Curated annotation (Swiss-Prot):
Coiled-coil blocks: none
GO molecular function, one term: FAD binding
Gene3D superfamilies: 3.30.465.10, CO dehydrogenase flavoprotein, C-terminal domain, Uridine Diphospho-n-acetylenolpyruvylglucosamine Reductase, domain 2
Binding positions for [4Fe-4S] cluster per the UniProt entry: 122, 138, 146, 155
Taxonomic lineage from the root: Bacteria, Pseudomonadati, Pseudomonadota, Betaproteobacteria, Rhodocyclales
Domain of life: Bacteria
Catalytic reaction annotation: oxidized 2[4Fe-4S]-[ferredoxin] + benzoyl-CoA + H2O = 4-hydroxybenzoyl-CoA + reduced 2[4Fe-4S]-[ferredoxin] + 2 H(+)
Provenance organism: Thauera aromatica
Cofactor: record remark: Binds 1 FAD per subunit. Binds 1 [4Fe-4S] cluster per subunit.
Pfam families in the record: CO_deh_flav_C, FAD_binding_5
SUPFAM superfamilies registered for this protein in UniProt: CO dehydrogenase flavoprotein C-terminal domain-like, FAD-binding/transporter-associated domain-like
Residue ranges occupied by any FAD-binding PCMH-type domain in the UniProt entry: 2-217
Sequence positions that bind FAD: 29-36, 111, 115, 118, 162, 224
Name under which the protein is recorded: 4-hydroxybenzoyl-CoA reductase subunit beta
Length: 324
């Protein structure tokens, strides 16, 4: 891994100052840097400046609000989220997702904002400079073709974040600040299906906080599969939230990660009102298969990753159904 190239560092004290600093060209936000800095060492980007967000007061705060909702600053560490008593009790899917990221050392530093906004990944992209140059680079960075689908005019690098799908099924919203002020969007709207430009943040915008509503009658869980449990990104990850009314599915949300260029909600309206049985599980598998787009973006085979995604989709809903 190469040494870092030269860049300036700004350390603003307020969100407003951070937004102003990010308005400059070739400037990137920096949280803990557990994803960004290794990529820069590989030559994946050459920013003129990094805006260090760790000095902004209150950005790491986790609090429950008067209406029972949860507010998490984008600077909160994954360790703090995973170990927070209220989150473990009321929003366990979020704690599960945070606790499943990488290893303990990573979680002690890595932030919520960084995990949500992490770069997409691909076996043709996450390589050294000499490896990529010998392969003619790729459409995501410096090249003119996607090696995953050669004739495509878009990048198919895959999003592998764990926390996003959990927040999506919990109906969480993202608070974004930027030159035009503040806006709030559903977490799913932070992303688009484009490996090269998977975030919808505009120039100068940054993620400030996440708000999660009270769970009410919903229960939720997150599960993933990876090669090495200690550190690896998910080959496939699934979050689900369920409302059960007797033997009837009163509400269901399912979100997937590790399969597409963005974490995606699976349209599951066809299952509402029915029982959760083998037929329903097969319907869910078909819906997940239709939503997902597993390609050769990792060294693990496509067929295996697809089978794992379908299997854990059923597993998560099975667990929620049996627990209610």
């Amino acid at each position: 891994m190469n040494i870092l190239t030269d860049f300036r560092t700004h350390r603003p004290a307020t969100l407003a100052d951070a937004v102003n600093a990010l308005a400059a060209e070739a400037t990137l936000p920096l949280g803990a840097g557990t994803d960004l800095l290794p990529n820069l060492r590989r030559g994946l980007g050459h920013p003129a400046a990094l805006v260090d967000l760790t000095g902004i007061d209150g950005l790491a705060t986790i609090s429950t609000l008067a209406d029972g909702s949860l507010r998490i600053g984008a600077g909160a560490t994954l360790e703090a989220i995973a170990e927070h008593d209220a989150i473990r009790t009321t929003w366990p899917a979020l704690a599960q997702a945070a606790e499943s990221v990488a290893g303990p050392t990573h979680r002690a530093a890595a932030t919520l904002g960084g995990n949500l906004c992490q770069d997409t990944r691909c076996t043709f992209y996450n390589q050294s400079e000499w490896w990529r140059s010998g392969n003619g680079y790729c459409l995501k960075y410096k090249g003119d073709k996607c090696h995953v689908i050669v004739k495509s005019d878009r990048c198919y690098a895959t999003y592998h974040g764990d926390v996003a799908p959990a927040l999506m099924v919990l109906d969480a919203r993202a608070e974004i600040v930027g030159p035009a002020g503040k806006r709030t969007v559903p977490v799913a709207q932070l992303f688009r299906e484009s490996g090269a430009e998977h975030l919808t943040l505009e120039k100068g915008e940054l993620l400030a906080a996440i708000e999660v509503p009270p769970t009410g009658a919903w229960s939720a869980a997150y599960s993933k599969v990876r090669i090495r449990d200690a550190v690896d990104f998910p080959l496939a990850g699934v979050a689900a939230a369920l409302q059960r009314d007797g033997d009837r599915i009163a509400g269901l949300r399912v979100a997937i990660t590790g399969s597409n260029s963005a974490p995606l909600m699976v349209p599951v309206d066809a299952l509402l009102g029915g029982n959760w049985d083998d037929a329903a599980a097969e319907t869910l598998a078909q819906l997940v298969r239709k939503t997902s787009n597993v390609l050769r973006t990792t060294i693990t085979g496509v067929k295996y990753r697809r089978r794992v995604l379908l299997a854990i989709s059923r597993k998560v809903v099975d667990q929620l159904w049996e627990a209610r």
